[in-house]
Amino acid sequence: MEVLKWVVTIVVLLFVAIFAFGFLSGDPSRNPGRGSGQ
């Protein structure tokens, strides 16, 4: 069942990457007053 494990790992990594990318890209848009990044 290595294929299933690989598929799950890839899906999780893609989901985390998309979530992180969307969060970083939408962080200043969501919190224009705070600006915790910079």
Swiss-Prot record:
Q: How does it sit in the membrane?
A: Single-pass membrane protein
Which cellular component terms (GO) are annotated to the entry? Answer: photosystem II reaction center; plasma membrane
Keyword field contains Transmembrane helix: yes
Q: Which gene encodes it?
A: psbI
Q: Which InterPro entries match?
A: PSII_PsbI, PSII_PsbI_sf
Q: Which UniProt keywords apply?
A: Cell inner membrane, Cell membrane, Membrane, Photosynthesis, Photosystem II, Reaction center, Transmembrane, Transmembrane helix
Supply one GO BP term. Answer: photosynthesis
Q: What is this protein called?
A: Photosystem II reaction center protein I
Q: Does the keyword Transport apply?
A: no
Residue ranges annotated as transmembrane are 6-26
What organism is recorded for this protein?
Gloeobacter violaceus (strain ATCC 29082 / PCC 7421)
What is the stated purpose of this protein?
One of the components of the core complex of photosystem II (PSII), required for its stability and/or assembly. PSII is a light-driven water:plastoquinone oxidoreductase that uses light energy to abstract electrons from H(2)O, generating O(2) and a proton gradient subsequently used for ATP formation. It consists of a core antenna complex that captures photons, and an electron transfer chain that converts photonic excitation into a charge separation.
Q: Outline the subunit composition.
A: PSII is composed of 1 copy each of membrane proteins PsbA, PsbB, PsbC, PsbD, PsbE, PsbF, PsbH, PsbI, PsbJ, PsbK, PsbL, PsbM, PsbT, PsbX, Psb30/Ycf12, peripheral proteins PsbO, CyanoQ (PsbQ), PsbU, PsbV and a large number of cofactors. It forms dimeric complexes.
Family affiliation: Belongs to the PsbI family.
* Pfam families in alphabetical order: PsbI
